Regions:
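Short, glycine/acidic-rich beta->alpha junctions
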Residues: 100-101, 122-126, 253
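Short, charged beta->alpha transition segments
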Residues: 24-28, 103-108
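Catalytic or ion-coupling anion/metal-binding cores of large enzyme and transporter domains
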Residues: 1-52, 57-77, 83-84, 89-94, ...
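A short, small-residue-rich loop immediately preceding and capping a beta-strand
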Residues: 109-130, 142-145
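Conserved phosphate-coordination/catalytic loops
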Residues: 95-99
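Hydrophobic pocket-lining residues that define ligand/cofactor binding sites across diverse proteins
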Residues: 65, 108-109
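Well-ordered alpha-helical segments embedded in enzymatic catalytic cores
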Residues: 100-107, 129, 257
């Protein structure tokens, strides 16, 4: 199987001299034309902390692809920020941005005949947008998560500020105290640090098998995240050699794995919306009732914000989500034979994973946060086609 299934039509032969000439103008060499082209879709932008570092990560990916025998080609797509636009007219654009991301990635890769694709995302809608684009194209692909922000020195984050707005409205704190939290709570790059939408979807994608092990929990600014980018450049060449496509990875069983991990982590209700769209894009039948079926046998184990105590950076320091996935696999709650972007199956990836050193963040099956899913699918006259609610067991406390 040729690793240049698409690019050869763009650059091979005398008739494509003009195309090659244009590519030489952006730095291609004669040798590059015989290599597989790998598109690198960056969601980097300075509109939000979630994405302000992603262009730099994407350049690491590009260099890794180039040094691994491919030709990396970096391009950008958009991002917006729900956290900034929340409560304003700007939120009307939030879900639309998912489709713009998917459409733009599909457009560039399809037009310019890239043989493989690596996408790098940070803010909420980046993850499903990238995966929908990947699914439509169905070329060897990897998703890289931009990583989480660390909490402030006072152990606060963006959501803390939202809570302080409520306290100010109630009269519990004054405006100076509110401004203090505003100034100190978001310090540098990375996605919101709890199990909010971004970390939920990053974890779902790792469980799905479309990102490298560990990608979902790594800190945005860290050696491990830089290494994730280097390793992705190496891994994409393996996927091209073996012709492992998203359709080989994003199977019905893999989506069931993703749902299971989302529930165990106490993840966002938005996962329902996004996983359904991702499954549809790859031709996998998935419905609301699947979340109920899986939820009846899957406990919530993670004591993570917003309803818990801990941040993703703390879970990362304790091993990330891989030990959790191994626990779920050993309990028969995950499908171990699913292929992943490592070129190995899920159970092969998890074989040598060490257990957590304690149960402070990820609880044991004997002492769960909740014995079944926190995600509830509701039907009624207000939602004839279904609705999603989150029930943590702490309501009213």
């Amino acid at each position: 199987m040729s690793t240049r299934k698409y690019s050869k039509e763009l650059v091979d032969g005398p008739n494509q001299a003009a195309s090659r000439s244009m590519l030489r103008g952006v730095g291609f060499t004669t040798e590059d034309f015989s290599k597989p082209f790998v598109g690198i879709a960056s969601t980097g932008a300075k509109v939000t902390p979630c994405n302000m570092h992603i262009n730099e990560l994407s350049e690491i990916v590009e260099n890794s692809v180039n040094s691994s025998g491919g030709k990396g080609v970096l391009f950008n797509t958009i991002t917006v920020s729900d956290g900034i636009s929340m409560g304003t007219q700007g939120m009307k654009y939030s879900l639309i941005s998912r489709e713009v991301i998917a459409d733009s990635i599909e457009t560039v890769v399809g037009c310019l005949a890239y043989d493989g694709l690596i996408t790098v995302g940070g803010c909420d809608k980046n993850m499903p947008g990238c995966l929908i684009g990947i699914a439509r194209l169905n070329r060897p692909s990897i998703f890289i998560y931009g990583g989480s922000i660390k909490p402030s020195d006072e152990n606060t984050d963006y959501v803390t500020v939202s809570e302080k707005v409520g306290e100010f409205s109630k009269g519990s704190i004054n405006e100076d105290e509110l401004i203090h939290y505003e100034k100190i709570s978001v310090e540098g790059p990375g996605s919101c640090g709890g199990m909010y939408t971004a970390n939920t979807m990053a974890s779902a994608i790792e469980a799905l098998g479309m990102s490298l092990p560990g990608s979902s929990s790594q800190d945005a600014i860290s050696d491990s995240k830089n290494n994730d980018c280097v390793n992705a450049g190496i891994a994409i060449m393996n996927l091209l050699e073996k012709d492992i496509k998203p359709s080989d990875i994003m199977t019905r069983e893999a989506f069931e794995n993703a749902i299971t991990v989302v529930i165990a982590l106490g993840g966002s209700t938005n996962a329902v919306l996004h996983l359904l769209a991702m499954a549809h894009s790859i031709g996998v039948e998935l419905c609301l009732d699947d979340f109920t079926k899986i939820g009846k046998k899957t406990p919530v184990l993670a004591d993570l914000k917003p309803f818990g105590k801990h941040y993703m950076s703390e879970l990362n320091a304790n091993g990330g989500i891989q030990p959790l996935m191994k626990n779920l696999l050993e309990r028969g709650l995950l499908h171990g034979k699913c292929m992943t972007v490592t070129g190995n199956t899920l159970e092969e990836n998890l074989k040598d994973i060490e257990p957590y050193t304690n149960n402070e963040i990820i609880k044991s099956f004997e002492d769960p946060i909740k014995e079944d899913s926190h995600l509830r699918i509701l039907y009624g006259n207000l939602a004839k086609d279904g609705a999603v609610a989150k029930i943590t067991g702490k309501e009213g406390t």
